[in-house]
Structures are given as structure tokens and as C-alpha cells.
């Protein structure tokens, strides 16, 4: 008995120190972070989102869910250098080659994070994504992201699209609170097999409650409005077809054209902010250098103007609260410099954009958005254009297939401008196509690509003799002659005294819905459901023997 007892005591003495010295991750629970306000940008022109601090930066909820034209790609000025992310407010650094988990409790959305956010041009980060992928993700967060060597990395989690969609639907003035868990360890665990940082023998685990309030929602509206502008060699603009809100205007000693280029709504909870700046920027560096600051100006009301000069002039968030539009003025010298630089046949969406800078968040406070309206700028000497007669960039139709169903009709306006009428004008339709029985058909497909349905298509216009000419178009990428269309001529005189003319006509692209061939697929199978297609209509004009 005594021997057995002694043995038991010895065993107990040997086991006890092992239990007492077992290591674990160090867990720190921080005091709740102060509530922070954010501004949410809903960009319907470019189909993306942006979130930015309305006041203090930390804890962070900042950045866009998509790259813009300001993305840094390794050269030039550094603007947008990561996508949107969150942190707990301490901006804690990470150790190279350690592993990192971040997960949320009381998350406002399922699957809120995609991985470890990093600055895209730092060594060890992905220039394309600004993301270090974890071993796995779940409905709460991500796990097993290896901290790469090179530039600094912090406890930042990249936001998922689901998180942005939640922020979008939040009413202005509402708040959410979540618990951010951030854990790093030197232990090389396998998160894909279920292991987690918090369960390892060493490391640091931080826990903090953060609260964010939606202080404002800026909705950028895509009006799809379209207008043509023809410019002569001296830069004098002439408005063509379109419904964009444009007018000729003189500001000081400069004459030119002003247009309402951005439409927006801004709802706030009374937030006051002057760190958010909005201003336009010319995309073409040569043109930006050639024009003066006052050759391009912008305004919130169309009457008081600011020059465009990089970041020097801007409107603040507070100033934008009293308006719902941004106007842009282009002087004749602006257009003249376009001619001198060889810039023609250009869309304003490719010519300039608006920039959004929040000086509070230098790494993720840059954003860019397109205009709500579009101007098609063309030279008045020897040019051709085609626009929808609805004055929209992307006209669309929908219908049903079957006997007696109406065709999908699209109307267009074709304009030529030159010293004389064009000697030849051609038109063609491009899109998904297939030849069946010697005839080309436009092909519409289901979302999964399994159903491909043929549709005939035609181009038609009124000739100068009053007859309707119809071509079988079939999306076949073949030119058809429309020189003999009925053109409406308007003469013009250049500032130099040279004369010319602008000629306009209309053309209709039609897709019948009642042709029997469209009841079956290209593989001769029956089908049901929805199919769709997109394509383009191109025009070209030729002038001969012009001195």
C-alpha cells in the first residue's frame, strides 16, 4: 500500500510541472474603439464602391472595391495603392514569415474578408491585387495568411464585395458594431485543415470592438446621356446631336462650351468634412501640359468656376452638400490644343475623369470616377459619327420570340462633316454570328452558354428617292453602302472663311422576333428561358479629291 502510494505521488510530481509550463497564444482585449463615421460612394457610372473616413482614420474602414485609373502600376505618381480594408485602430505590424488570421464576431455580413491587405508596390505584395491570399476563408474571416518578406505589412483585412453591399444598403445615420480578432504566430499551422492561430502554442491575439456610423451616401448617377461636339481647326465647338446639358459660354475672356458632366445625390447625417476633395483631371499628359489652368474649369452651379490644376483647386465635401451636379467648361483653346496634339474622335470618358482625394487617408483615400454624361468630340473637317437616336451610349431592347411578336428595333443618327459631302459612306454590324444555310445570323446565348439561338437582322434607311433600302445584316462584320441615303445638309463656315457642310441621316437596325429559325438553337434543339447578345454598329466615310 505504501509503495503504491509513493509511486502515485512520484507520478503526480512528474506530471504537474509539464501541465504548469504549457505555453499558449497571448490574448489582449483592448478597450472599445471610439465610434467612427464614414462616407460611402455608390458609383453607378463605373459600377463600383468606395468607402472613406468622415473624420478620424482609425479604426480603419477605407478604400474602393475595384481598381480605378489611378491604380499604381510601378511608375509615375502613386495614388491608389490598395483596395479597401479594415483594422482595429492600432495598425499593428506583422512579422515576416509568421502566419496571420483575422475574423469578425458579430459581423454585419457573411464572408466579410478575403485576405491580408498590403500596399501593392511593396516587396512581397501582389501588384495586381494588393492581397496576400490566406490558406482558407469562412463566414467570419480568413486564416493562415503567410506574411511575406519585404515591405511592411499590418493587421489589415481586405473587404469582400459582400461587405460593400452591406454598407450600400445601410441607411444614413445607422451604425454597426463588430468585434475584430487579429492573431499572428510563428507556428507553421495548416489552416486549410482547421488549425487556427488562436490555438497555437505561441503568438499574439488581439480583440477589439469597433463601431462605424454611415454619415453620408454619395450616389454618382449614370444618366447615359450623350452629345456630339464638332470642333474646327481653331477649336471653336459646334454642338451636334445629343441631349447632354451643354451650352456655349464665355467665362472672363475665354469662350467655349460648358456641360453638366456629373449628376449626384448626397445624403448626410449633418457630417461636416473638409478633408474630402473632388476635382477633374485630364487623362492625356501632353494635353494637360499644353492647356492653361483656365482653359478647363469646373463648377457646382454653372456660374462660379474654379480652374483645373492638379490638386490645387477642388470642391470639398461640405461644398458638395449644397449641390447635385458638377459642370465643366472647355475653352476654345482647350479644343484647339486637342487638334494640335492630334487628339480627335475621342470620348470624354477617355479624355478626363474626376478624382476623389481624402487627405485623412493617404494610402487608400484616392479614387476616380467617370462622368455621368458623355461627349463625343470630333473634328468638323472630315469626320463621321453614329449615335443612338435615344442619345444613350448603350441602347438595349428585350422581347419575346414567337409568331406575331414585335421586332427589336434600334434607331441611329449618322452624321458626316467635311468641306463637301462624303463620296462614300459605309455601315456594318458586328457581334456573335453564325452562318446557317448560307445566311449569317446574329447569335444570342444563355448565361451558361448552353443555348445559342440564331436571329436574322437587317439594316434599313430611306434613300434620296424616298424608297426604303434594306440590307440583310446578320452581325456578319461586312460593310454595306449607304451613300445614297436621304441626307439633311447644314452648311457651315469656318472662322478662316472656309466653307463646308454637315450631313445627317437615320438608319434602323432591326432584329425580328417572329422568324421560325429562332424557335430552335443553332444545334437544332428546342429551347426556353432567356438569351442575350451585344454588338456594335460601325460607320466609315471617304472623301476623294479634296484639296
UniProtKB/Swiss-Prot annotation:
GO CC annotations, alphabetized: pilus
Signal is among the record's keywords: yes
Induction per the UniProt record: Negatively regulated by H-NS. Positively regulated by IHF and EcpR.
Secretion signal span: 1-23
Entry's localization field: Fimbrium
Keyword annotations of the record: Fimbrium, Receptor, Signal
Domain of life: Bacteria
Keyword Signal among record annotations: yes
Family of this protein: Belongs to the EcpD/MatE family.
Subunit structure: Forms polymers. Interacts with EcpA.
Protein function: Part of the ecpRABCDE operon, which encodes the E.coli common pilus (ECP). ECP is found in both commensal and pathogenic strains and plays a dual role in early-stage biofilm development and host cell recognition. Tip pilus adhesin, which is required for assembly of EcpA into fibers.
Protein name, entry field: Fimbria adhesin EcpD
Species this chain originates from: Escherichia coli O157:H7
Primary gene name: ecpD
